[in-house]
């Protein structure tokens, strides 16, 4: 039986998701696409509660040493940390793939 990790979506990641959904709904005029993407984010993030270490750590430093991992959902990367002490998966960023990931992650806390 595999361990089940609790899911923690940090405030920065919550802000990212809200911003993405609002941008697609309002600026692009595609509210249904925004809702579909939000559902896809939720579905994929929820899969991380089981065997989150199946996803390898990122290659870039210092995030690799910190144990940061990422998954891709559509055109976005979802960054997260596996905290074995707390048995938690901490989602700390959701960033559009076309952006400079190193710059975007540079301003983020590794965990909270």
Regions found by a protein language model. Name each.
Residues 1-67, 102, 110-112:
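Basic, Lys/Arg-enriched alpha-helical interface segments
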Residues 28, 73-77, 81-112:
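Enriched for short, Lys/Arg-rich terminal
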């Amino acid at each position: 039986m595999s361990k089940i990790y609790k899911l923690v979506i940090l405030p920065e990641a919550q802000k990212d998701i809200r911003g993405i959904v609002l941008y697609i709904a309002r600026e692009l005029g595609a509210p249904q696409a925004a809702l579909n993407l939000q559902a896809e984010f939720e579905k994929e993030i929820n899969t991380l509660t089981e065997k989150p270490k199946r996803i390898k750590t990122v290659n870039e430093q210092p995030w690799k040493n910190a144990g940061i991992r990422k998954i891709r959902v559509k055109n976005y990367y979802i960054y997260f940390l596996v905290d074995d002490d707390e048995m938690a998966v901490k989602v700390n960023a959701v960033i559009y793939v076309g952006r400079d990931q190193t710059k975007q992650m540079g301003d983020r806390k590794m965990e909270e």
